[in-house]
Amino acid sequence: MPEHTKVSAEDQALLNKFARSYQTQTQLKADVKEAKTLIDNINEASDEILLLDDEDSASIPCRIGSCFVHFNGDSLNEHLEGKKTTAEKVLSEKTSELDAISADMEQIKKVLYAKFGDQINLDAEE
């Protein structure tokens, strides 16, 4: 029977930190995906506005919250550019956070695998 390594309080703290980081990483991945989707949707909407003729672009409904506001083509493009800039900033921040937490998790994994070897599994099942 293989000998089991004792888990110290420091080891338990590292395991707990890894678990919290994993949850944060999962949420950040979802946030990054959401921001990318929003940017893609804004780009698609901007492209569609360019295809409209002058008559159709005089009053374009845009959902803001739970209601629709009518914009002309130029003001809607400005509105979309503002939203895109905000979404790109959020994407950049979330990506940086994700990279930092992933690097931290890799360091924790190295320490824990060095001590426990194959007695633990810290790799995500995807």
Swiss-Prot record:
Molecular functions (GO terms): unfolded protein binding
GO biological process: protein folding
Record's keyword annotation contains Chaperone: yes
InterPro entries documented for this protein: PFD_beta-like, PFDN4
Domain of life of the native organism: Eukaryota
Record's GO cellular component terms: cytoplasm; prefoldin complex
SUPFAM superfamilies: Prefoldin
Keywords: Chaperone
Assembly and interaction partners: Heterohexamer of two PFD-alpha type and four PFD-beta type subunits.
Protein's job: Binds specifically to cytosolic chaperonin (c-CPN) and transfers target proteins to it. Binds to nascent polypeptide chain and promotes folding in an environment in which there are many competing pathways for nonnative proteins.
Family of this protein: Belongs to the prefoldin subunit beta family.
Protein name: Probable prefoldin subunit 4
Species per Swiss-Prot/TrEMBL record: Caenorhabditis elegans
